[in-house]
Amino acid sequence: MHNQAPIQRRKSTRIYVGNVPIGDGAPIAVQSMTNTRTTDVEATVNQIKALERVGADIVRVSVPTMDAAEAFKLIKQRVNVPLVADIHFDYRIALKVAEYGVDCLRINPGNIGNEERIRMVVDCARDKNIPIRIGVNAGSLEKDLQEKYGEPTPQALLESAMRHVDHLDRLNFDQFKVSVKASDVFLAVESYRLLAKQIDQPLHLGITEAGGARSGAVKSAIGLGLLLSEGIGDTLRVSLAADPVEEIKVGFDILKSLRIRSRGINFIACPTCSRQEFDVIGTVNALEQRLEDIITPMDVSIIGCVVNGPGEALVSTLGVTGGNKKSGLYEDGVRKDRLDNNDMIDQLEARIRAKASQLDEARRIDVQQVEK
């Protein structure tokens, strides 16, 4: 029930990664990267499908060898989500995965080879209508830039990025996006700010090597949140030393928190105190797990008492306000019913699923009317 965030998106050009539009006002795409051995086709396919189930728009796969390229061919045949091939050092691998239908090439022109090899990759990408991501990383800056700046700085990352952008410009290739990642939040944020002023290509956001599930999510939320709130960013990845599925969940949580893009349920829950009339924490944890399959955007508030419960319920799709033995249920800001505190989880799950179905049907009818 909350309005969309008043964020003015940075204007950028439009590219497509598979069937996913990137830039020029398109929804911010959420992506992750597999951490299986690419040559283990079964494990990689299973992980990609798990990422698809939680909403991944794009998945990146490392392709370090020709054997991995042959495995990529088989993987591509078995999944639906667009795949980005992560290529370093050997330009021939990029040419090979292009034959196999890759949706995007992630390369670093600085380590892919000489001018002729870069031209061959770009010509192949142009012929097959494959976009490229230029991936600059503070941990792998060119040696001359390391010597010039002494350490990674925003100016160093910008210079590296512009060097590669200019290279593609000279080759008359404009179907690309750019990232300037760093593990330090301030370094990454300032680098992206500088880059956003220099080019109009789409930007892929990320705080690289952010850390484990908890600390990495915090760093990413701060860094990506700052940039997104300024309208910067067209795709994003939350980099975690954790299950890649968690990267997608955190990515959508960041977008939901900024009211930029919603997928699934946005739970609003109190941290609990002695006033709670039912087990709020247990209820929220159980519902988050049970309702992962719901993709309908909804705000659901679960508050343990009447101090803040009614106020949150007024601006929620569904809201529960704790009461003695029974708690008030609100729908679209109107009190509708009372739920037994001892059976809260099952009752609330049923109500949420019913509301999601109702909203989906209403949207389907709206779409049909527009199409008429």
Swiss-Prot record:
Keyword terms: 4Fe-4S, Iron, Iron-sulfur, Isoprene biosynthesis, Metal-binding, Oxidoreductase
Keyword Iron-sulfur in record: yes
Pfam families per the UniProt record, alphabetical: GcpE
Catalytic reaction annotation: (2E)-4-hydroxy-3-methylbut-2-enyl diphosphate + oxidized [flavodoxin] + H2O + 2 H(+) = 2-C-methyl-D-erythritol 2,4-cyclic diphosphate + reduced [flavodoxin]
Cofactor dependency: [4Fe-4S] cluster
Pathway(s) per entry: Isoprenoid biosynthesis; isopentenyl diphosphate biosynthesis via DXP pathway; isopentenyl diphosphate from 1-deoxy-D-xylulose 5-phosphate: step 5/6
GO biological process: isopentenyl diphosphate biosynthetic process, methylerythritol 4-phosphate pathway; terpenoid biosynthetic process
Signal peptide: none
GO molecular function, one term: 4 iron, 4 sulfur cluster binding
Presence of keyword Ubl conjugation: no
EC number(s) per entry: 1.17.7.3
Cofactor note: Binds 1 [4Fe-4S] cluster.
Binding annotation for [4Fe-4S] cluster: C270, C273, C305, E312
Listed transmembrane segments: none
HAMAP family attached to this UniProt entry: IspG (MF_00159)
Family: Belongs to the IspG family.
Function as written in the Swiss-Prot or TrEMBL entry: Converts 2C-methyl-D-erythritol 2,4-cyclodiphosphate (ME-2,4cPP) into 1-hydroxy-2-methyl-2-(E)-butenyl 4-diphosphate.
Protein name as it appears in the record: 4-hydroxy-3-methylbut-2-en-1-yl diphosphate synthase (flavodoxin)
Organism field: Shigella sonnei (strain Ss046)
